[in-house]
Amino acid sequence: MFKGHPKGLLAAALSNMGERFGYYIMNAVLVLFLCSKFGLGEGPAGTIYSFFYAGIYLLSLVGGLIADRTQNYKGTIKTGLVIMASGYVLLSIPILATSGNIGWLLPLTCFALFLIAFGNGLFKGNLQAIVGQMYDNFEAEAAKKGPQALAEAKDKRDSGFQIFYVFI
């Protein structure tokens, strides 16, 4: 399946799959967690969820601007992964707290959600840009070999993005 594609495609696809796995699982239980752990009603829990979800899309713009200004897409992606992982670790702290004063855990949870959204903003769009750059480089190398090789390389871009999106 990956034969004839740039070597980084597998790593990009697996990174994307891992990130989406964690994201969708967390999204599936977030409102239930907020209601059961903190005793929030559906309205306040839904508001937190809505702000988190909106933050993911708004912070993607910020992540794109940062990557464009620095021209360091790989560094931005790595930073996003570290920030997201930090958010997931912080999000696990309230799960471990079983009794006592847990009032401080709701702000911690909201901060963890912000970290996840910001890390996602740094990671998601820039990973797709890196995949596009891989194929730009792949096509440039193929162009040196002739028009037939270039045509084959251009066909690989479409199937490469198809493979990449299957891993979402």
Task: Identify what each model region corresponds to.
Residues L122-A143, P147-Q148:
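Intracellular juxtamembrane helix-capping segments at the cytosolic ends
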Residues M26-A45:
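Short amphipathic helix-loop junctions that connect adjacent transmembrane helices
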Residues T79-L105:
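C-terminal ends and interior cores of transmembrane alpha-helices
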Residues T76-I77, T109, F161:
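Primarily marks hydrophobic transmembrane alpha-helices of the MFS/SLC 12-helix fold
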Residues T47-R69, I77, L81, A85, ...:
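Central cavity-lining transmembrane alpha-helices of secondary-active solute carriers
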Residues M17, G87, G100-N126:
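Hydrophobic core of transmembrane alpha-helices in multi-pass small-molecule transporters
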Residues G55-I56, A149-I168:
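Glycine-rich segments within core transmembrane alpha-helices of 12-TM secondary carriers
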Residues M1-N16, R20, L96-P107:
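Cytosolic juxtamembrane N-terminal segment immediately preceding the first transmembrane helix
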